[in-house]
Amino acid sequence: MKFLNNSDIRIRVLVDLLNGPLKIRDINKKSLLSYSSISSNVHKLCDEGYVEKIHNSFQLTNLGLIYITILLDFRDVISTITDNSDFWLDHDISSLSIDDLNKLSSLEGSELIRCNSMDIYKTHKEFKRLFKNSRNLKVIFPYLHPEYPKLIRRLILKGIKVDLIVSRDILDGFIRDIGKDVVKKGIYDGNFSIKYLSHDIKIALAISNEFITVGLFKLDGTYDQNRLLLSNKKKAISWGLTIFDSYDDNALPLILDWFLDIF
């Protein structure tokens, strides 16, 4: 890796070759680097086993493909952490698995929504806007905000597909505030499911086909309502779906018969 990291030209060549074999003059046109610099570094890459010559073109070897993929992924992770360093520094990340953290590069380019003195409800308003425009939604709520059951209720009544996971201690409150009849209708109609976990949840997650939002708890144990990470990139949405699915696998479903008896 040191051989690659020490030269931006070599990395640029490998990136250009990710899309398939190229001649040196093709790399020259794409990169605007000097022909001699490209030629010299391409041959060094060949000597190290990262690139091979096929007829008059050059292509990545398996080794080159593996290394440049890892290197670009690592750079995205560093970019993700650096761009929002305070978000990752002073929050509880115990809700994320090692595998989730290994794939933080998926959040590269995310926007950090912050409340400020001019708009102390900025994150909440952004959350509401995203909810209202959703066509389907998967949500993990770690706490009961008075507005969120109302948002869920409206979506259910509009026939929007909603999958909800909450902790057991706020389950009753969510059902009460959404409305027993609406919950029952959503479950019967197949556009609403609600599951619960017996332990505390340390992440707020909302995912649709078009966005993902991530909220975390501060190190003092309180939920940070002033910062929200937002992305509309497919790889970020996929990252969030993986997390949701892992929680969903461990959550207990609301059994309709039991629900009717209790409520």
For every predicted segment, state its role:
Residues 32-44:
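Short amphipathic alpha-helical interaction segments
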Residues 18-23:
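Short capping segments at the starts of secondary-structure elements
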Residues 85-165:
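PLD-like (HKD) phosphodiesterase/transphosphatidyltransferase domain
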Residues 26-30:
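A short acidic, leucine-rich amphipathic alpha-helix
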Residues 49:
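Glycine-centered, phosphate/nucleic-acid-interacting loop/turn motifs that mediate DNA/RNA or nucleotide
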Residues 142, 147-263:
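C-terminal regulatory/effector modules of DNA-binding transcriptional regulators
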Residues 53-75:
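Basic, amphipathic "hinge/linker" alpha-helix immediately C-terminal to the N-terminal HTH DNA-binding motif
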Residues 1-12, 37:
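Short alpha-helical segments that sit at the start of domains
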